[in-house]
Amino acid sequence: MRENSHAYFFTRFDCYPYHYDCLERAGFTVKNCLIVEKGTIGGIGDLTGSYANNAEWIIFCQKGRRTFQHTTLLENRKKEGMQYHAGRERSKKYKTRFNACWFGEEYPKATYNSVWQKQHQIYHPTIKNVECLSWLIQISSLQGELVFDGFMGTGSTALAAIQTQRAYLGAEIDKAYFEIAQNRIKEVEKRNVTNYF
């Protein structure tokens, strides 16, 4: 991975300590963990004696140092141009710093629900929402830069990269999922779609 770039790793609460340790040993600086509302509620495990898993854990880390890109993804609730604390910059129209918890209507969901999967005939146990990935990509990279996904599944990261004018490289071990990803990418490129949410 290039110096001064961001990385996002999707995980679970029980795997977080192991992944955190692996990332640090690989030379990443772990900045924090995003908790993003899923588009669905998980339904496996202890269904009567455990809380439903309705959040995706995403480890945010970097190699070197990189700041967030200025985007128009989310309007600031504070009035533009106001100075709320002495010595700090005046507020901007759009947020330049995002919360670590993405819940509610103003943020995209992390995954698609079963209705979306049925409508699109795309079934994957951990399919990610293209809009959510698009936000992460826009916050952390510039147009033309390379986005890599080592576990591309059905290609949501590729679609988000295409939609935000980034180069894309991915790997997938499962041939069936790889073929779905290829078909989704071809469909988007054929239609030259810029909004695939």
Can you name each region flagged by the protein language model?
Residues 1-7, 13, 143-144:
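Short glycine-dipeptide loop
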